[in-house]
């Protein structure tokens, strides 16, 4: 059988799975019999050959039939068909991953448009809310603030030494659901599954991590099945000291590792990115990944409306870390088109729970002030739209139904093709649905959402609303990081990713309302995005590997394939 691909390991460290061209197979890791069947990385279930069964002590431990990978997949799909809810399907797939990693990824990658909504948005929201109640088996690492002073020792308990990416959260702001504490661990687990399923990043180098600093969610503290530390969150200073120790420990224990910050509270997300981005290889997906996929949607929309990014006037509903990340990346793209940073920021306004950001407000964080422009104070979004005259409206408020009919109609009066992105998730938090956007704009809106919605019919046309989901970006960036091992991660990499993604949207797809490529071909899409990002890494002299002659071929050489390998 074909062999699963892997990457060369530096400095003599050993991966948990055999190398791409290795022949020692299971013997190289000393697994036989039941131990082999209980290893999800090496388990082949019913696909072991007769020679493998004889050599590895498996005779009598598995059914007599030797099945192909396709037949195994058929059984999985049949069993999934008997599940009645997406949460049940999620639980089934998690159990599959715990038993047979190869078959899990073969399943997800066989039909990404079907399975991404199950293993991630929107099902992941319910899975996180019920995390302690559906918990089966430990995955990733749980690092408690009570271990402060001993973080390096804890990290050394992880069995894989060549970790390339740690995805880490403190559970402080999970999706649009707020503080979920340890329940938020579902997010790093799911994010890293998408690294592999969407961009082919080898899973053995990926580590989900939860930094447990407590929770202020009293309902969780009262839940007897809650899995986290039962105490309120610490002071900001105590938290940041803990994160400092964590970041330093990662650099020592996993020297080739990039830190992916995920779902921290808004002010912490902005502060921690600023604190570390020029010191270590790290990024924040909520800030940079969200900014990149939104910029990609804007670039695609401009293929319809004409014009450049620098000419757009943008209003955000929401002014937290996501809005700041989006605004910062869009402003950087405007600077690349010739504007000064100050002029680019002047094109972007924000509106939050207390109204329009303007200099007279005394409740603003420093990172919000570049987007507080001289305007009369206002708590009326429609009035702000009429005054500012934006070409694009972006919702990152986490509050559903806030793009009301008057809001959409105001945008439609100002623009022949208003660009309206309702990015909050999960589904019930979306600022408006595609049906509302198309109906209230009379079919004129160029719409995208943060979660997947079904097709919409309006005025005799069928619209396919695009999903501006970060999974178009962060797995590809993760693959580029995995392959090039950059010393730093820069905004230029995310801008390049946005252009590479938008370039793959066809005129026919734009005509149907799609602003992003179809999910059905997401691996090919993200390989091309990763190659573009890799070129930026090499052009910036940030890579720690030699530049290849062909970046796309280089990326493809690292892509994991969910195929069993020969073990004897």
PLM features per residue range, with description:
Residues 380-389, 398-420:
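Rossmann-fold NAD(P) dinucleotide-binding segment
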Residues 42-43, 285-289, 302-305, 418, ...:
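Adenosine-phosphate binding glycine-rich loop
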Residues 206, 256-262, 308-312, 337-346, ...:
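Flexible, glycine/charged-enriched surface loops at secondary-structure junctions
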Residues 357-359, 376-378, 396-400, 407, ...:
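N-terminal Rossmann-like NAD(P) cofactor-binding subdomain of oxidoreductases
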Residues 2-281, 536, 552, 558, ...:
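N-terminal ligand-binding/catalytic initiation module
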Residues 154-155, 176-187, 218-225, 269-275, ...:
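Short acidic, glycine/serine/threonine-rich loops at helix termini
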Residues 279-280, 284-395, 544:
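Glycine-rich phosphate/diphosphate-binding loop of Rossmann-like nucleotide-binding domains
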């Amino acid at each position: 059988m074909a062999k699963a691909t892997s990457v060369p390991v530096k400095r003599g460290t050993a991966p948990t799975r055999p190398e791409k061209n290795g022949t020692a197979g299971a013997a190289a890791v000393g697994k036989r019999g039941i131990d082999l069947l209980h290893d999800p990385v090496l388990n082949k279930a019913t696909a072991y050959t007769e020679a493998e069964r004889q050599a590895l002590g498996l005779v009598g431990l598995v059914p007599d039939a030797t099945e192909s990978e396709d037949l195994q997949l058929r059984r999985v799909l049949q069993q999934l068909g008997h599940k009645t809810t997406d949460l049940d399907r999620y639980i089934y797939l998690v159990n599959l991953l715990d038993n047979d990693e190869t078959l899990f990824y073969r399943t997800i990658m066989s039909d990404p448009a079907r399975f991404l909504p199950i293993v991630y948005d929107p099902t992941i929201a319910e899975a996180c809310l019920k995390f302690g109640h559906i918990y089966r088996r430990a995955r990733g690492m749980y690092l408690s603030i009570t271990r402060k002073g001993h973080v390096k020792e804890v990290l050394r308990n992880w069995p894989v030494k060549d970790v390339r990416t740690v995805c880490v959260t403190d559970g402080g702001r999970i999706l649009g659901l707020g503080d979920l504490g340890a329940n938020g661990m579902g997010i790093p687990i799911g994010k890293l599954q998408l690294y592999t399923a969407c961009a082919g990043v080898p899973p053995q180098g990926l580590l989900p991590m939860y930094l447990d600093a407590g929770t202020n969610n009293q309902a969780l503290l009262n839940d007897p099945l809650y899995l986290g530390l039962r105490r309120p969150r610490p002071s900001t200073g105590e938290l940041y000291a803990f994160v400092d120790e964590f970041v330093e420990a990662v650099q020592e224990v996993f020297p080739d590792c990039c830190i992916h910050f995920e779902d921290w509270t808004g002010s912490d997300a902005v502060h921690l990115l600023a604190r570390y981005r020029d010191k270590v290889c790290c990024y924040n997906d909520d800030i940079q990944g969200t900014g990149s996929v939104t910029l990609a949607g804007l670039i695609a929309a401009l293929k319809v409306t004409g014009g450049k990014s620098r000419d757009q006037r943008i209003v955000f509903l929401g002014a937290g870390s996501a809005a700041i990340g989006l605004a910062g990346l869009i402003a950087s793209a405007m600077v690349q088109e010739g504007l000064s940073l100050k002029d680019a920021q002047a094109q972007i306004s924000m509106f939050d729970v207390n109204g329009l950001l303007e200099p007279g407000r005394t409740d603003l964080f420093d990172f919000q002030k570049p987007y507080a422009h001289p305007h009369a104070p206002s708590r009326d979004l429609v009035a702000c739209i009429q005054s500012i005259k934006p070409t694009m409206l972006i919702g990152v408020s986490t509050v559903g139904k806030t793009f009301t009919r008057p809001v959409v109609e105001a945008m439609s009066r100002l623009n022949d093709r208003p660009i309206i992105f309702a990015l909050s998730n999960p589904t019930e938090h979306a600022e408006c649905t595609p049906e509302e956007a198309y109906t209230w704009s009379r079919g004129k809106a160029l719409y995208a959402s943060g979660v997947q919605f079904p097709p919409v019919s309006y005025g005799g046309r069928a619209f396919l609303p695009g999903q501006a989901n970060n999974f178009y970006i962060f797995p590809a960036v993760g693959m580029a990081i995995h392959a090039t091992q950059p010393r730093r991660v820069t905004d230029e990499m995310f801008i390049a990713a946005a252009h590479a993604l938008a370039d793959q949207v066809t005129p026919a797809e734009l005509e149907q309302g799609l602003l992003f490529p179809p999910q059905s071909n997401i691996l090919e899409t993200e390989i091309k995005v990763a190659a573009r990002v890799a070129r930026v890494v090499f052009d910036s002299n940030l890579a720690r590997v030699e530049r290849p002659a062909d970046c796309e071929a280089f990326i493809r050489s690292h892509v994991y394939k969910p195929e069993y390998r020969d073990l004897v």
